[in-house]
Amino acid sequence: MSLSANKVIRRKSAPTPKKLKVVDGAVHIHVGANLNYEASNIGYVMPATDVLNAEFAGIALEELNVAAADNTSDGTYEVLVLPRGAGDEVLMDVHDAITIANEGDPVYVYDDDDVGLSASVTNTTGGLVGIIRQFVSANKAWVQLVQHPTL
């Protein structure tokens, strides 16, 4: 049936940033850092690395730098995070050399600064960060943060 009048467009807004608890010990999280949940203690975040079974948590929106002596138990400190699955498009550094043909490809945690294509990473399960939506240069792209289909 064709529209004969304007209709109300209903949408859900993207998730808002949220505070996540940080692992214990010496931690320096920079603004823009990719964060993973700690593998052995889900619920606490740390700077991301490409390790099997780690789960991407989001991108840090604030800096946190604490010494081990001041951070003796998990959850003492929190950091503001743009969460996994937020739907936002974020300009990201890509470890691999990419081309416009990579638009639509998934990218995964490479480290706290970069994402990578599946061929260059170990963790292609929980490490999914998002989908390349726009090629910018050989090592830079707009990436849409998406929820992992199995999480």
Language model features with spans:
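Surface-exposed, low-hydrophobicity beta-strand/loop segments enriched in small/polar/acidic residues
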Residues: M1-L151
